[in-house]
Amino acid sequence: NLITQLSGRGETPEFSPHITLLGQLPQSVKWIKAKMIECFHEVDPIHLSFSHVGMTDQYFRSIIIHAHPNPVLEQLHTSARQHFEIVTNHTFVPHLSLLYSHLEPHNKKLLMESIAIGSPLSVTIKEAVLVETNGGLDQWQEVFRIPLS
């Protein structure tokens, strides 16, 4: 897959494709699981399409594919923030990360420009997954998974 290819070329860690709805939750896993059941039990799968490839100076968003605006996902994000009691000034930017890295901008740009993505690119999100992100990427662990109805 593309993430594996870019990770190999950039000598950076590989990871599973995902859309991050919320991150860095401070509560216990038990509490988060209960809130996930409340929040996601009646949510239908979400169809998400993507617009273009971009890059940022953030490690976890080094090279990304931007998602087209999606009112259902936006509403789910707002609802999840309320369920999980998250107060933030950060703007929700739905995207699919393709590369985690601290590469120099020039090298990142070369990798980004080498990406050929068929159009249109879309995915259907069929589940919500809780991942403990303590430690390095190789220490991340999936702890809970709930299918969308």
Question: What are these model-derived regions, one by one?
Answer:
Residues 1-48, 69-124, 136-149:
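Basic, often amphipathic N-terminal segments
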